[in-house]
Amino acid sequence: MSVLRAPGIYARDRLPLERLRAGTPALAPDDDVFTNHIHADDLARLCLAALWRGRGARVYNAVDDTEMKMGEYFDAVAEAFALPRPPRLPRAQLQATVSPAMYSFMTESRRLRNARVKRELRLKLLYPEVRDALRRFAGQSQRE
């Protein structure tokens, strides 16, 4: 049995667009935290790869190749969809502005690597970088 650690699942219909439209703030760059992402389609493919090729008692980080801070992610989504970037606030001010659950989410920092996924499961991601996926999604929105 393998364990998949999958933070930050996104897809075309799982983006923080409403959050950006609402103007929900993000951490100031000096306080910003690292975050990890995986496209839902890549996660599904990774589940199958782990089922068929995963080694027993292994933990696989189900993340893409993007190294990005959370505020940078929100900025990239805003840029791709021509939305305003979120205001950036220092930690103390952000804590006074958002709910405790949102604050907890926005201050958790993770930096996971997917080398084991690539090496052992031999999975080539369809969406290796968040920015590439966002450009594709934005192009689809313009055609709709």
Please provide the spans of the model-predicted regions.
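Glycine-rich "substrate-gating" loop/helix at the edge of Rossmann-like oxidoreductase active sites
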Residues: P7-I9, D30-A40
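Glycine/proline-rich active-site loop of Rossmann-fold NAD(P)-dependent oxidoreductases
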Residues: G8-G23, A28, A49-Y60, T66
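Short, glycine/charged-enriched secondary-structure capping and boundary segments
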Residues: P16-R21, D75-V77, L126-Y127
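Residue-level signal for the nucleotide or nucleotide-sugar donor/cofactor binding architecture
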Residues: I38, M68, L112, P128
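Mid/C-terminal beta-alpha module of Rossmann-like enzyme folds, strongest
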Residues: A44-M102
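Conserved C-terminal active-site "lid" loop/helix of NAD(P)H-dependent oxidoreductases
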Residues: Q95-K124
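Amphipathic terminal alpha-helices
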Residues: P128-E144
